């Protein structure tokens, strides 16, 4: 996928207007260890990305310069991610945390990816792991008619409306974010 997604001499700004979706299978580095200081209180912390790039256009986001491309890569091998998470959690007597949404917004394209539909079912069964879902999206349909899952954390970015308008282009308003909580 990198031959299509991230070659040199692409125009990020032009692609951001109408990005393409690239479906791919991630083959290595499915689950990565976070830096030691990157924790919300767990002994072991990991991150992963089921997708590369974001539909939003936040001016301060490192994704604006991370890749040469504004196209989206959606990894389709969710079971491989889940199997890696299960390996990390097996035979552990302590809680682990897995952060989703490092290279994307975890909820933004849920209607296309079905990422959470798959992952939430799996995390219900993994008693010693937490899943943190990072988002600015109000795309919460996946949670409707579902009982809360005790080991799933939804981390919303909430900023004053003036900051949202100035720096977080294409994102929901503060009111919409709060209403979705």
Identify what each model region corresponds to.
Residues 175-181:
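Conserved C-terminal portion of the radical SAM core fold
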